[in-house]
C-alpha cells in the first residue's frame, strides 16, 4: 500500500466514523434537547411544580448513563459491540416513548432513567477503534467528540422552537424515533 493511500481514511472508515458520530450525537441530543425547556414544560405535569423532582428528572439520565457505562462496555467486549449498541438504542427509545407518554413527573423520571440506561458511549468508541486503522483512530474519535459540542449548540437553538411546535412529549417522541432510525444504521456497519 502506498503512503498516499494509507494516509487517507478508507470509505469504510469514513462511513463507520460518520455513522458512529451520528449515533453518539443522538445520545447527546437526548440529553441536551430538553435542557432549555424542561423546567418550564415540566410545570404542566402533575408533580412538576416540585423543583426537586424536576431536578431529579433532569439528572437521572446522566446518573444512570454513568452507572451503566462500565457494565455496557464489558458486555460489548463479551457479546459484541453492535449487539450492545442496538440494545442500548432500544432501551433509549423505550425511555423516550415512556417519557413522552408520562402522565406525571414520576413517569418522566422513569423514562429519563431508561434513556440514560441505554449507556452506549463506551461501546460506540470501542467499535470506532475496532473499525479504524490506528493512524485514523484519532480523527474518528475527534469526529465523535465534536458531535457533543454540535448537539449542545443545536439543542439550545432548536429546543425552544421544537417545544413551541410539538411540545415536550413531541421532543421525547422525536428522540425515540431517531434512536430507531440509528438502530438501522448500526446494523449495516461492518464488524
Regions found by a protein language model. Give the residues of each.
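Short amphipathic helix-loop junctions that connect adjacent transmembrane helices
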Residues: 36-51
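C-terminal membrane-cytosol helix-exit motif in multi-pass small-molecule transporters
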Residues: 177-191
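Hydrophobic core of transmembrane alpha-helices in multi-pass small-molecule transporters
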Residues: 25, 95, 106-119
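Pair of pore-lining "gating" transmembrane helices in MFS-fold secondary transporters
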Residues: 13-40
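Residue-level signature of mid-helix packing/kink "hotspots" within the transmembrane helices
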Residues: 62-70, 152-153
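Cytoplasmic helix-loop-helix junction between adjacent transmembrane helices
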Residues: 111-148
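Conserved MFS/SLC helix-loop-helix module at the cytosolic interface between two early adjacent transmembrane helices
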Residues: 67-103
Amino acid at each position: 500500500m502506498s503512503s498516499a493511500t494509507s494516509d487517507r481514511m478508507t470509505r469504510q472508515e469514513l462511513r463507520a466514523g460518520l455513522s458512529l458520530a451520528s449515533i453518539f450525537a443522538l445520545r447527546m441530543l437526548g440529553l441536551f434537547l430538553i435542557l432549555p425547556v424542561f423546567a418550564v414544560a415540566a410545570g404542566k405535569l402533575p408533580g412538576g411544580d416540585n423543583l426537586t423532582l424536576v431536578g431529579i428528572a433532569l439528572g437521572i439520565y446522566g446518573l444512570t448513563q454513568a452507572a451503566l457505562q462500565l457494565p455496557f462496555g464489558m458486555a460489548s467486549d463479551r457479546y459484541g459491540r453492535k449487539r450492545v449498541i442496538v440494545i442500548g438504542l432500544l432501551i433509549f427509545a423505550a425511555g423516550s416513548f415512556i417519557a413522552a407518554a408520562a402522565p406525571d413527573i414520576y413517569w418522566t423520571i422513569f423514562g429519563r432513567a431508561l434513556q440514560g440506561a441505554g449507556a452506549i458511549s463506551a461501546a460506540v468508541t470501542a467499535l470506532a477503534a475496532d473499525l479504524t486503522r490506528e493512524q485514523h483512530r484519532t480523527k474518528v474519535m475527534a469526529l465523535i467528540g465534536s458531535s457533543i459540542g454540535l448537539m449542545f449548540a443545536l439543542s439550545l437553538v432548536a429546543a425552544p422552537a421544537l417545544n413551541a411546535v410539538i411540545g415536550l412529549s413531541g421532543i421525547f417522541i422525536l428522540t425515540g424515533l431517531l434512536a430507531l432510525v440509528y438502530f438501522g444504521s448500526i446494523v449495516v456497519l461492518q464488524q
